[in-house]
Amino acid sequence: MDFEKIREEKIRFFEDHHTIVIATSHDNKVTARTVSYATEGLDFYILSWEHHEKIQQIKGNPNVALARDNISIKGVAQILGKPTDEKNKRGAEAIKKKRPKEFEMFSRIPGMIMVKVTPTYIKSWVRVDNRFFIEHLDLEKRQAYLQKPDE
């Protein structure tokens, strides 16, 4: 499989959507919730209040999972800080482009922070010639391959 082609397909898919489920965990407690996001390439940018449970869990364990439709993602979250800080300009621009009203409304609220999720692995169900496969996109190894569901 062509790694870059599959990667570009995923980029386009996530550009066309606005919400995703993020699962976070710490001290053997896992929680999940739907969040709004924007992407730059395959990096996801999310706004949240710093006191929210997901942020506290990310502080203790940056490994997260994202899910949308038939796609699941393993990734690493990084708390960037205030969305209006100069150092967060890339993420802020991505959110402004995709969700300008949301950025304007939430970015200046005290306690609002930006989180960046960098995917490491993407797995999805795909159909090829009327047969279902699990498509793997290993972003760390830069590999893409199909797997039969019964393997």
Where are these regions (language model features)?
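A generic secondary-structure signal marking the coil-to-beta-strand transition
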Residues: 10, 18, 42, 111-113
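Short secondary-structure boundary/capping segments
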Residues: 11-12, 36, 56, 104-107
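Charged, gly/pro-rich active-site loop segments
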Residues: 72-151
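Short N-terminal signal/transit or membrane-insertion segments
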Residues: 1-11, 48-55, 59
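Short beta-strand segments
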Residues: 17-50, 55-58, 64-68, 76-78
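Extreme N-terminal tail/first-helix region
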Residues: 1-19, 140-151
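Short Pro/Gly-enriched beta-strand edge/turn motifs at strand-loop
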Residues: 15-21, 96-100
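A generic structural signal for short, non-catalytic loop/turn and secondary-structure boundary residues
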Residues: 15, 59, 66-68, 107-110, ...
